[in-house]
């Protein structure tokens, strides 16, 4: 076994086909981080026949007196199930990095442990996960444990929606509450539009207070993953909002008038009481719908072309769509 430096194309070829592949383990991501203060290195591991059996993008910085710390984002890309091979690799890597002035190497490979449904029920378990953890411990990697919050560089849990079904099946799989909110948004005039690189400043206005990254980070991300980044905006069509607000108000007015007529005609005390209660609720709705109509009308006057209300930054990688930020 030897540890070598890989050329960019060698690294990409290996990384793109590894079982633990991730967009974090790509030359594109490395170039992004290089622009923001990190040095990068493409590490490779070859066997006695010079076949590549492991690789990783390493990000590193000098911290003091020529000493450095390194991080392998969603790496190392290696067969952790082979305990003997992992131990040999770890020992060689430790000696090499120590000679080169590295104090610390952090890794967080994508090793699936289990798949849960929305309620937390376990649907599938990776039988290798416990073996891998024990092999890493035996090779003297310091295990951070099953973290629950934000103790690590990358999150322990990832939310996943399978998109291999038709759109109606996917929609019907959502909770009733979520489906209601989607329908309500559509009725209110919310539309989804796709943006481009020129719209990054607009996107940035939505996220700059939530996240510490500068706008240049997203511009560089878009550039390095060229052709695989999509910007989406939720836009309120103010004209549609007024039309639908008016419909709701007018419909409730009809219901209210009908209730008033029924109250006048009711001879039974219990029936009359029930109708009065229904009218009270209808009166409340009319008041709400009237306020919404006034608000919608003012929005239309001030924003005749609509209003952008939210945005998301999506990366398409390895037959999946990753929501980078929203």
Where are these regions (language model features)?
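Acyl-donor binding region in acyl/amide transferases
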Residues: 67-151, 202, 291, 304-309, ...
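Active-site neighborhood for divalent-cation/phosphate handling
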Residues: 155
